[in-house]
Amino acid sequence: MNIAKKALVFTSVVAIAAGTSVSAKTRLSGAGASFPAKIYTRWFFDLAKSGGPRVNYQAVGSGSGRKAFIDQTVNFGASDDPMKDKDIAKVTRGLVQIPMVGGTIAFGYNYDCDLKLSQEKAVQVAMGMIKDWKELGCKPGKLTWTHRSDGSGTTKAFTNSMEAFSKTWTLGTGKSVKWPAGVGAKGNSGVAGVIQNTPGAIGYVNQSYIKGNVKAAALQNLSGEYVKPTVEAGAKALNGVTLDENLAGQNPNPTAKGAYPIACLLYTSPSPRD
């Protein structure tokens, strides 16, 4: 999508959030997912530069952002986990839930190994069942699982896929779960930071955090292919998502050939009466 189209989309979103026409004098605030924070920051910068409103977005996590929106302390919330009917009912001023962008969730790791994970092995890693890299076909070394410590839509999407991958997964799904092992960190940036600075660490992060010492594992899909979390592989996964009447949808283990198996849509939830 080019900058002009992005600006048009975001002008529409912020117009809903403001409940009126928008201009450079308009100031809006949003809070939520860290997953799309990088692209949102860029889009909001481009929007302001083109004469649109100034938007302050705080990447506090999907759970905190949703609460802030329900409590009416921000103009819009953002999440990688769409709002359900029970949460929508709490928004007395109404809302319009809009899927804005999609992305993949990578198994990011810091170790000298060309890592390929079957779906069963991926679940075992996330469950804290694997303690040494040799169990994954790599040279021996301590493996440190790294996870989110805050309420996170990334965690919700990740655990949805883990549950779809294998019956070995017993932690359930949600924006937070009781991890039996590992190191917790706040936000995608926090998890990526732990992995970056801890040789032998592995965890789940937005694909945009795959850089430096943080490499992405190739993950097995339902076609038996081992796929990296590329834009193309993510698009193939998201093409299979069917949206409901609230524009919400998910596909925790896509069947398409070439699809990366952990991908999700990212939503904003402005209010038309704010």
PLM regions and their residue ranges:
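Bacterial N-terminal signal peptides that target proteins for export
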Residues: M1-L8
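Bacterial N-terminal signal peptides
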Residues: T11-A17
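Sec/Tat signal peptide C-region and signal peptidase I cleavage site
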Residues: T20-A24
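N-terminal segment of the mature folded domain
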Residues: K25-K134, C138, A192-Q196, I202-G212, ...
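Ligand-binding pocket segment of bilobal, Venus flytrap-like solute-binding proteins
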Residues: R66, K156-T242
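Periplasmic-binding protein-like
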Residues: P99-F107, A217-L266
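Extracytoplasmic ligand-binding site segments that recognize negatively charged/polar headgroups
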Residues: T104-G108, D114-G193
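Conserved small/polar residues in nucleotide/adenosyl-binding loops
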Residues: Y267-D274
